[in-house]
């Protein structure tokens, strides 16, 4: 019996699903519930212990126990298997993983390539990249912790492929992990050349892909491995292992790219980043698996600011009690590293201190709709606030936000003022993002 079947025989599907949602028994081995994957009022989510299968007749989601854990916890198959094996008390060697020789081979090959890149960085051919890292304030300890390497030139890549073949790996193996790509004429070229190489790890610390930064001129500046059985960009966060290592009650920073993560870590901040994609709902959930509070600090340029707003739109409906994502807008089009280098760590701390919670983000966005001496724009302001609050799925949070919004609105109406009037005992916060002032009435209630 392989490990997958052993797990299925050890844990009932309803036992796993019942930890997340309330199941209603239909008969001895079948259950029905409200679907955890979409909003519905009438239960259409069916669970069968006999078949080891779930199916929602509303949204079409279906699968087995591994599919469910992968979808609900935003993890890869390997991580789902490890979690369920631990839950079932089944011992197995993750490093050898003999039940799946192909997977074992891919993990071994990825580690082998990563080790080779590290050797390149420490060799004479890596001097330029080493100097680049040192100039950015990234020391040897950080380089080692992130396993940073160098892919080398065509000659060194040819030599790497030759050695890998001698060790029993095939070109097909190398194509599957994204080291080599094949064109229409069946010719093979190297995916990463003359790039600073950063291994992307899964939650168990295994290399599953790479990110490469070009040193010097050329495009694309950043390049990720193609998606594989092991690597899914929309579900993976970069830096999770080191973020957990450096957390120690410090603030977790969410930034745009892996160089931001490495730089922030070198300054003492645990950090994670998405991998060339807009931050997804899956990745937001993964962030909260690291810390109950995180600070989104994207670049201060227009692209970074717009990306921040898109993340907020995804985050707002999914607000949870005791899970907070706060938003920071850096001034002067700076990225986090540039801001720290220019202003120092104390100023960066102040920026984090002034981070906005969800309610204040709604408020700030609403203020953009107000025009002085235009009552209709005030009505648009109120409607905007209420419509955004109505998107929140958690009933308790929604009601708390409604109460706070109503108190702020009543203060405005009572004083017969508009939010731009500085004489009405309002706290004024200056944000560079929209060149507007965010005015928060003093209600005595704080909702972050």
What does each model-identified segment do?
Residues 7-10, 28, 99-107, 123-126, ...:
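Conserved phosphate/pyrophosphate-binding and hydrolysis machinery centered on Walker-type P-loop NTPases
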Residues 69, 274-277, 298-300:
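Short beta->alpha connector loops at strand-helix junctions that form conserved
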Residues 73-80, 84-85, 194-212, 337-342, ...:
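Structured, non-catalytic alpha/beta "coupling" segments that mediate domain-domain communication
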Residues 79-131:
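Conserved active-site segments centered on acidic
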Residues 202-203, 244-251, 281-294, 300-448:
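A charged alpha-helical hairpin associated with nucleic-acid processing machineries
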């Amino acid at each position: 019996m392989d490990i997958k079947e052993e797990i299925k025989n050890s844990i009932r599907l309803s036992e796993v699903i019942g930890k997340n949602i309330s199941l209603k028994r239909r008969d001895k081995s079948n259950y029905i519930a409200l679907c955890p994957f979409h909003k519905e009022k009438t239960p259409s989510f069916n669970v069968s212990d006999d078949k080891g299968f779930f199916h929602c007749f509303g949204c079409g989601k279906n699968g087995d126990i591994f599919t469910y854990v992968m979808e609900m916890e935003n993890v890869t198959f390997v991580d789902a298997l490890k979690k369920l094996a631990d839950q079932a008390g089944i011992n197995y060697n993750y490093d050898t993983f003999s039940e799946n020789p192909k997977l074992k081979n891919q993990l071994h090959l990825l580690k082998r390539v990563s080790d080779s890149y590290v050797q390149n960085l420490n060799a004479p051919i890596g001097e330029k990249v080493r100097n680049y890292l040192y100039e950015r304030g990234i020391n040897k300890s950080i380089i080692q912790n992130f396993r940073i390497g160098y892919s080398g030139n065509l000659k060194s890549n040819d030599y790497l492929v030759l050695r890998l073949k001698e060790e029993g790996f095939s070109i097909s193996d190398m194509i599957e992990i994204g080291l080599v790509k094949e064109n229409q004429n069946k010719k093979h070229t190297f995916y990463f050349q003359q790039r600073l190489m950063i291994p992307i790890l899964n939650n168990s610390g295994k290399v599953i892909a790479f990110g490469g930064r070009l040193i010097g001129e050329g495009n694309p500046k950043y390049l990720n491995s193609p998606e594989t059985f092991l690597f899914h960009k929309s579900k993976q966060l970069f830096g999770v292992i080191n973020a957990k290592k450096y957390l120690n009650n410090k603030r977790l920073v969410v930034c745009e790219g892996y160089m931001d993560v490495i730089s922030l870590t070198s300054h003492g901040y645990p950090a994670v980043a998405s991998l060339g994609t807009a931050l997804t709902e899956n990745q937001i959930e993964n962030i909260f698996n690291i810390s109950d509070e995180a600070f989104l600090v994207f670049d201060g340029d227009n692209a970074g600011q717009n990306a921040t707003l898109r993340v907020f739109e995804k985050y707002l409906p999914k607000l949870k009690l005791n899970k907070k994502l706060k938003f920071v807008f850096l001034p002067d089009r700076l990225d986090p590293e540039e801001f720290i280098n220019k202003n120092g760590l104390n100023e960066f701390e102040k920026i984090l201190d002034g981070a906005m919670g969800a309610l204040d983000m709604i408020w700030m966005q609403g203020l953009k709709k107000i025009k002085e001496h235009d009552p209709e724009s005030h009505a648009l302001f109120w409607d905007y606030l209420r419509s955004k609050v109505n998107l929140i799925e958690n009933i308790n949070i929604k009601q708390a936000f409604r109460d706070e919004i109503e108190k702020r609105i009543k203060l405005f109406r009572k004083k017969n003022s508009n939010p731009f009037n500085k004489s009405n005992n309002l706290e004024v916060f200056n944000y560079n993002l929209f060149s507007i002032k965010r005015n928060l009435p003093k209600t005595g209630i704080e909702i972050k």
